């Protein structure tokens, strides 16, 4: 039996191995055998000390089950079986040899089990150990049912019954059965294993209940113990339950009660009336309720506060709420007022007790305190000189519109100064909102000199320099906000503040008190500015205008304003020098004022830049600006101190801008201020230095307003002012230099209004600076700088500032300033340009616009959809087609041909229309372009081998074209003829249109043209060449190139019908191309209908050509080619080529060979038929039909 068993066992092992991918099956068998052997080995020991082992096992198993209780459902817990299997494997050999008899009894069932597990393992290697256990258990149950019938063990039967009774009993019986199995030898062991299996089967219900606890056997236990008994494993579930029950018992709250320590009790309870009451209950937040471990036997005292939920209508806690509900006294009833709720009142009308009286008094006092607090705040505001706003109605915002708070004149000054202290934030908000309002008022034509000066006077005042203040306001205000530049250029449209500026210009003595005029000055500025006598107020208004326009645009008025500020000691002294100069300056300001006002939006940036040059101290200009627009002034004063005409305007524009674009403007403002400070340092004038003290004042005042708008800008302005004051003192003459720069910048910024702004600026500049010299210089500089500085938006501000500098220099000496201005202009222009690149206005330079316009002019005379820039490129690209040819070749023929024919039809129609309507222009322009195109085309066609069609001129080119065509032909036989026609088409289109069309035409022609395309193109081109040249007035080479492209397409149709004809007709490379591509495309398009379909897709003239044959296509091709050349549309030539080339496919053979010598005879009939063919084509052919159909 031993041998046979071994043999059987070997077979079984082999079978297992055969069914398994891994050795798992065999290992499992060995492991199980080893397990059984181990059990047998330990039987004696177990007999001697069964109870001892049982206890130890039970303890270990219980621990293991406790550990794996949480792993019941995870199959991974089955890994423990791996360990058990491994442990069994260790004893496999010894057990196998020793227990051969045992294997007889156990071998078959185990083999079955092994096979099953083996098959399972085969399907899933990684999990075979894990899931093998579960399957193994099932197999055990099966085995016990099938094979264990003979072993009806009393213990087992009793065990199965007991299992159902109780988990604890089941565990005990299982252990007993396990012990008995250990005692029994051979059959007894197999019986026990069967019992175990059957026990598992009996316990499957339990396992399900436990969710297969057996799956998660303790991995931690020794392998032998784990693996010793399957039943033991199965019983783990019950064990787990029992253990879990015990564990739950330990975890029961009852247990916790017992565990509570005095410390724990003291932590969670409070002694209340001699009892330890749950402190959470007393606080009204014990969530355990009746289950709480601590006593809740206490009456909760209500907190002496009204329940806010009860007050709002409903409290979910009801009587349990710790806050007062209806016990709270009714304040209406007890205060003597009538309680409309009466008996239904939710609050108590009972007599007041000491407690309730305290509560009532507290409530009433709270209301009084609120009222008193408001009154105290209002009193504080009044003390500070701030008129408190009326209490807004409920639902209205806290901040009313600024006008409600105060007028922008005197009240604004006080208000702003107060804001600078404690109310800076609110004022800044008001000013931000109000400034645009003021600008709008100026635009509307209102007085708002005061408002404007305070809010947005900078632009308007200066704008008004030349026109009356009212005119300045109306025109300036409207232009100031957005189109400062353009309006600045137009004198009438200066900033609304310009009237103030005007007065400043008018009054030689600018108002010295720039800072005082700031709030009140603006209103006065309108009147006093008009009056030379009121220097201070005009200065104030000027300062806002200077910020807006006077300071910016009238470099001199700006300086005058600034100078008065700078020279506040001698208000008007700087400007008093010459009222005429003042007027000129004001005019200049007015001219630049629109730019100023426009810049006001960009102003704060440019203002800083221009302020130093215009004002010796930015603070001066800031003071002026602040006067004009205290809130905005902060930003705009920077412009003011920068107060180059344009920059100031830029700054002024930003005055409203701070509200609109504070972040961006501030960023630009900082940039411009820094840049312009450098410029100002170079161009700062001495007079600017004079008002440095006032600048400080203005800076302080401005700082207050600036604080309202933003502390960062304020600090920057202060720093810039200090720096610029020194620079201005040092570089007062340099401001003259900056004047040309500023005008340029102003013009650049007024680019949108280039026509208006330059003119206006020119006029004021002329007035300010020796109307002829300085003005033309300024204008030229302004124009040039625009173009030069057009890159930067800040440059406009600088140009405006330059104008102001010019005005100021006119006072100080325009000649000197102009000299320095030129040098400074270059430096400043460079700086401005670099800075301007950062500004979004960089793209607006006049030069840039002019170039596109000139290009547009080219387009206009061409009147084609072709971009004129391409013709320039086309010239270069004409030679590029060689390189481009490979590009179109890679394109898919069907796609490119389909796409190209449709556009070419449109293009051909356009070309025909354009050719007819503008034949003269096209002949001239196209003759120029076509000549170039013809030359290029001849070269390209020669390269492509189309010269054969054209004749001698093309003959030389054909040689060049032949190798190219051949090269292209060799690698891409199908596309080479197309490339030839494409090259021709591209040449035509390049001559007229440019390189970009070449690839289009090439793919289009290559796809539709086919092998016959190149041949027919060369053949048909000679006849078409004279027609194209004569009709289009283009050189024969050009028209022939187009014709060659067309002939290429015509051969396509013919090529589809007969490729051999194409090959014969084609000469030189054309014949080769026809043969190669003809074979390819003829095979692709063996049917003539595809060629026809292609033709209809192409323009009508092309279709006509295809229908009528070489003559028609030739005639059409010359026309279309001429047209194509005129518009320089590559798509048109391609279309013509695609459509015409195909019809000429067969003809081109004939045409090319004889056509080269005599193309004209073909052209005559072709022309006649072309017209018909065009009409017919449009009628008969479907433009959407695929050329490959």
UniProtKB/Swiss-Prot annotation:
According to the UniProt entry, which residues carry Phosphoserine? Answer: 1158
InterPro entries linked? Su(sable)-like, Znf-CCCH_ZC3H4/6/8, Znf_CCCH, Znf_CCCH_sf
Which regions are flagged for Acidic residues bias? 13-28
Q: Where are the zinc fingers (C3H1-type)?
A: 273-299, 301-328, 329-352
Question: Which stretches are annotated as coiled coil?
Answer: 27-73, 353-385
Compositionally skewed regions (Polar residues) per UniProt = 718-741
Q: Where is the signal peptide?
A: none
- UniProt feature, compositional bias: Pro residues: 505-525
Superkingdom of this entry's organism?
A: Eukaryota
- Biased amino acid composition, Basic residues: 47-73
Set out the biological process GO terms recorded for this chain's protein: negative regulation of DNA-templated transcription
**What's one Pfam family here?**
zf-CCCH_9
Q: Where is the composition biased (Low complexity)?
A: 461-478, 639-659, 1009-1020, 1056-1069
- Cellular component terms (Gene Ontology): chromatin; nucleus
Recall the GO molecular function terms of this protein's record: RNA binding; zinc ion binding
Q: Which PANTHER family match?
A: ZINC FINGER CCCH DOMAIN-CONTAINING PROTEI (PTHR13119), ZINC FINGER CCCH DOMAIN-CONTAINING PROTEIN 6 (PTHR13119:SF22)
The protein, known as: Zinc finger CCCH domain-containing protein 6
- Which organism encodes this protein? Homo sapiens (Human)
